[in-house]
Amino acid sequence: MPPENLRFSKGTEVLIPRVGEDPMDYNHCTWLSMPDVAIGEMISVFNTDNNPLFTATMFNATLQNEFAMRVEGGSVTNLYFEKLKNIEVSFPSIQEQEKIAAYFENLDHLITLHQHKCDELQKLKKFMLQNMFV
């Protein structure tokens, strides 16, 4: 694709997958926190003045069925942004969004730390088992 046809992020976009194999595949929204990242054609971009982390989390938690009802296609489904424009969503205040987003961000960090610890314990177990019967 020629560089002039690329879309670049501002760093606050919510990204919604446009292509999936199943209508329920569309609960993988995320937000792009970095500016100047090229965004592929198979991604719908939702620009918002709301907290993007909160928005992506809310979309994943509450709009999966709404998204699934709007997909088109058979073995490969498509979710076109035009089909999403008439979904009504209410947002709490920005302050509440910030608090909720921070809570989930901290929870994600905690999960990552525990996963890392679990991975290290698995390695230790493997090492101990290998050396136990030498």
Model-inferred region functions:
Residues M1-V134:
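Feature detects amphipathic, helix-rich regulatory segments
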